[in-house]
Design a protein with these regions (language model features):
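Short, contiguous, well-structured surface segments enriched in hydrophobic/aromatic residues
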Residues: 151-154, 165-170
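Bacterial N-terminal signal peptides that target proteins for export
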Residues: 2-16
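Substrate-binding cleft and catalytic face of glycoside hydrolase catalytic domains
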Residues: 118-119, 157-162
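A Lys/Arg-rich helix-loop hairpin that forms a DNA/phosphate-binding surface
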Residues: 173-179
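Structured, charged N-terminal subsegments at the starts of enzyme catalytic cores
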Residues: 129, 137, 141-152, 159
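His/Asp/Glu-rich metal/cofactor-coordinating catalytic motifs and the adjacent surface-exposed loops
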Residues: 61-130, 134-140, 179-349, 353-621
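Alpha-helical bundle segments that constitute or directly flank the non-heme di-iron/ferroxidase center
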Residues: 82, 152-159, 347
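Bacterial Sec-dependent N-terminal signal peptides
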Residues: 18, 22-64
Length: 621
C-alpha cells in the first residue's frame, strides 16, 4: 500500500499529540462519560470513581419525536442515528419539517443495489488479466451506496443487518474470489431491509454466500455406512446468532433464571442435530462448466437436489417435521417454528438498537421495540401506521427504535448510560457525507481497499473476521468505567493500543485532503498495478476529496470554525473544555493572512482531525 500523505510536521505533531490526549482522556468533556474509550497501557492514571447510577426511567414512557426536526442540531442528531451521516443541505432542508414524514418517505425509496454495480466492474476486467477490480467490487458498491445513495435509511438498515446475519469475504478464500456471492447477499439484505425478518431469514438461507460461509452448501443426508452426518454449522448459528440466542429471555431482553438463579438454556445438541437435517440438499443451481467458470450461479438462490435431502424426521425446539419432507417445505416449517419463539423479538430488537442508538439499552426500551417487532406495527408520532401487522416487520421495528422516547429525549445527551461509541466505519462515512467527498468512482480510493486492520479502522464492510462480527453484542469492556457498571459496549472490543492511533492516522489522512495531496505518479502506478485499468487522472485526484469551501471561509476564525464543525459533525455535543482545547491548538497553527490558502487548508484539516478524535465526538448520543 502507498505511503500516505503526511501534513506538515508541526501540524502532524500537534494533531497526533492532542488527538491522542483527547481520545484517551477518558472523560474529556460532556461526551465521555461511562462509554468513553479505555486508556491504553501507555497512559498511567488512576481511574476516576464511577458516578452514581441515574434513577430508572418511568415504566413504559410514551414514544415521542417531539422536536426531532425542530432544530438543526436535533435534525443532525436524528440523521446521525438513522443514516450514514447528515449533510448540511439535508439538515437545512429538513429542519422544521416532520421526522415522521421523512421516515415514511424513506420507506418508499427504491433500493440502491450492488449487483448491477459489480457487473460493471466485472466488465472492466481485462482479458487474461487480474480480476481485482471485480474482486473489490463489493467494497466499491458499498462506499457508493453508503455515501451517495439516496435511500439512506435502507442502506443503514442493511448494514446493521449485515452485522447480525454475518457473511464475510475476509481471508482471501472463495467469497473473496467470487464477489458475486457477497454482492448478491448485500442485495438480499438491502431488499429485505424494510420487509419481514421471517422472509429475510428464508432469503438468507437460500443465498449461496451464506451456504458457502456456514458450510451447508452441498450438505448431504446422513450415511449410516460411512458415519457421515449433516453439517450442523448453519443450524447452530441460525439459533445462536440469528434468531433466539442460547438462553431464555424475558420480553425486555433480560435472562430468565431458574429456581437456582441460573440462566435457562434453550436447546441441546440434539436440537441442533435435528435442525441440521433441514438444511440438506441445497446447492448452487448449476455447476461449473468444463472450463471451470461459474456462470451466474452465485447470483441466484440455491436449489434442492433431492438425492441429498435427509429423509429422517427433524425434531428441534419442540417442533417436529415428518420424515420424507422435501427441503423447501422443511425450511418453511423450521423457520416458522423458530420465528414463533418468544426470544426472537427481544434478541433481535436489542441488537438493532445497539446498531442505531445505544449500546446498553434500558430493558424498557428493549421491551417497547420488541413489542413493535412482535406486533409488526408501529404508529409514528404523526399517527401514520408503519408495518404490515405480521410479527417480524422490520420497518415497524426500526421506527420503534428511532422514535422511542429514550432515543429522542434531550436528557439522553447528558445521560452517561445512554449512547454508543461510534463505529469506525460510520465515522468515515459521516466525514465523507458531511464534506461532500467524491464517491462516484470508489475504485480510485486505493487506501480504502481493506480497512479491517487496526492500523486503519478495524472494520470493513462485509469483512468481519468471523460469523461473530467485528464485536460481540454482549461485550463488556474490562478495565473501563462502563465495564465497572456492567454496561455492554460492543464497539470497545475493537478499541486498543493499536486501533486508537490507527484511526487517528487514518482520519488525518483524509481530513488533510487524502489522495489530492499525494504523489500522482505513485498513486497512478498503484492503481494500475492493483486494478489493471487505465488511470483517469481527474478521477484519481478527486476520489474521496472533501469540499471544504464552508470551512475555509471560517479558517481565519478558529472559534467560529470549531463551532461550525461542532454543529456539523457532533450536533453541538462538544463540551466547552473540548472546544477550548481545539481552538488553542488551531491558534498554534498560524495563518499569515487572508491569502494564505495553504495555512487555511492546514488549519481546517487539523480542526476536522481534532474534532473527529475527541471523546465528545466518539461517543454518539
Amino acid at each position: 500500500m502507498l505511503q500516505r500523505f503526511q501534513p506538515t510536521r508541526r501540524a502532524y505533531l500537534t494533531t497526533a499529540s492532542l488527538a491522542m490526549l483527547l481520545a484517551m482522556g477518558g472523560c474529556g468533556g460532556g461526551g465521555g462519560g461511562d462509554n468513553s474509550l479505555p486508556a491504553t497501557p501507555q497512559v498511567v492514571a488512576p481511574p476516576p470513581p464511577p458516578p452514581s447510577p441515574p434513577p430508572p426511567p418511568p415504566t413504559q414512557p410514551p414514544s415521542s419525536s417531539m422536536g426531532a426536526f425542530g432544530t438543526e442540531l436535533g435534525t443532525s442528531r436524528f440523521l446521525t442515528q438513522a443514516t450514514f451521516g447528515p449533510t448540511q443541505s439535508e439538515v437545512s432542508a429538513l429542519t422544521g419539517t416532520s421526522a415522521s414524514a421523512w421516515f415514511s418517505a424513506e420507506l418508499q425509496k427504491p433500493a440502491s443495489l450492488n449487483v448491477p454495480q459489480l457487473q460493471v466492474y466485472r466488465s472492466m476486467v481485462p482479458e487474461d488479466g487480474d480480476p481485482n477490480i471485480a474482486v473489490y467490487g463489493t467494497t466499491y458498491s458499498f462506499w457508493r451506496n453508503a455515501i451517495e445513495g439516496n435511500d439512506q435509511l435502507r442502506q443503514r438498515m442493511a448494514f446493521a443487518l449485515s452485522q447480525i446475519l454475518v457473511v464475510s469475504n475476509f481471508g482471501g478464500e472463495t467469497l473473496s474470489d467470487i464477489p458475486e456471492a457477497v454482492s448478491y447477499y448485500q442485495d438480499v439484505l438491502t431488499r429485505n431491509a424494510f420487509g419481514n425478518y421471517r422472509n429475510l431469514l428464508e432469503d438468507v438461507t437460500y443465498s449461496p454466500a451464506m451456504g458457502h460461509y456456514l458450510t451447508y452448501m452441498g450438505n448431504q443426508k446422513a450415511d449410516p455406512v460411512t458415519g457421515r452426518m449433516p453439517d450442523e454449522n448453519y443450524a447452530r448459528e441460525l439459533l445462536q446468532l440469528f434468531t433466539i440466542g442460547v438462553i431464555q429471555l424475558g420480553p425486555d431482553g433480560a435472562p430468565v433464571l431458574d429456581a437456582q438463579g441460573q440462566p435457562i438454556e434453550l436447546y441441546t445438541n440434539m436440537d441442533i442435530t435435528g435442525l441440521a437435517r433441514v438444511f440438506t440438499g441445497l446447492n448452487v443451481f448449476e455447476f461449473p462448466d468444463d472450463n471451470g467458470s461459474f456462470p451466474d450461479v452465485w447470483l441466484r438462490p440455491m436449489v434442492e437436489y433431492a438425492d441429498s435431502v435427509s429423509d429422517a424426521p427433524k425434531q428441534f425446539l419442540n417442533c417436529s417435521i415428518p420424515g420424507n419432507t422435501n427441503t423447501a417445505d422443511s425450511i418453511d416449517q423450521a423457520l416458522d417454528c423458530i420465528m414463533a419463539h418468544p426470544n426472537v423479538a427481544p434478541f433481535i430488537s436489542r441488537q438493532l438498537i445497539q446498531r442505531f442508538t445505544t449500546s446498553d439499552p434500558d430493558p424498557d426500551y428493549v421491551q417497547r421495540v420488541a413489542t413493535a417487532f412482535d406486533a409488526g406495527r408501529y404508529s409514528l408520532p404523526d399517527g401514520t401506521a408503519v408495518g404490515t401487522g405480521r410479527k417480524g416487520d422490520l420497518s415497524a421495528t426500526l421506527a420503534a427504535i428511532l422514535f422511542d422516547s429514550d432515543a429522542r429525549s434531550d436528557s439522553a445527551l447528558t445521560d452517561t448510560r445512554f449512547g454508543k461509541v461510534r463505529e469506525p466505519l460510520l465515522r468515515f462515512t459521516q466525514w465523507a457525507r458531511a464534506f461532500d467527498a467524491d464517491a462516484r468512482y470508489p475504485e480510485y480510493g486505493i487506501e480504502l481497499l481493506d480497512l479491517s486492520e487496526p492500523s486503519a479502522l478495524s472494520q470493513h464492510p462485509y469483512r468481519a473476521r468471523s460469523v461473530f462480527n467485528f464485536y460481540r453484542p454482549g461485550y463488556i469492556a474490562p478495565g473501563t468505567r462502563s465495564g465497572a457498571l456492567g454496561m455492554t459496549a460492543p464497539e470497545l472490543q475493537i478499541v486498543n493500543a493499536s486501533s486508537t492511533p490507527g484511526y487517528i492516522n487514518f482520519i488525518m489522512y483524509w481530513a488533510y485532503g487524502g489522495q489530492s495531496r499525494g504523489d500522482y505518479n505513485a498513486l497512478a502506478q498503484e492503481v494500475s498495478r492493483e486494478l489493471q485499468i487505465p488511470v483517469d487522472r481527474a478521477k484519481l485526484e478527486s476520489a474521496f476529496v472533501p469540499n471544504y469551501a464552508d470551512e475555509l471561509a471560517l479558517a481565519n476564525d478558529a472559534a467560529a470554525l470549531v463551532d461550525h464543525l461542532d454543529r456539523l459533525l457532533a450536533y453541538g455535543s462538544l463540551s466547552i473544555e473540548t472546544k477550548t482545547s481545539i481552538v488553542t491548538a488551531l491558534e498554534r497553527s498560524p495563518i499569515a493572512g487572508p491569502g494564505d490558502t495553504e495555512g487555511q487548508r492546514e488549519r481546517v484539516g487539523l480542526a476536522v482531525s481534532l474534532v473527529m478524535t475527541s471523546p465528545d465526538y466518539l461517543v454518539q448520543r
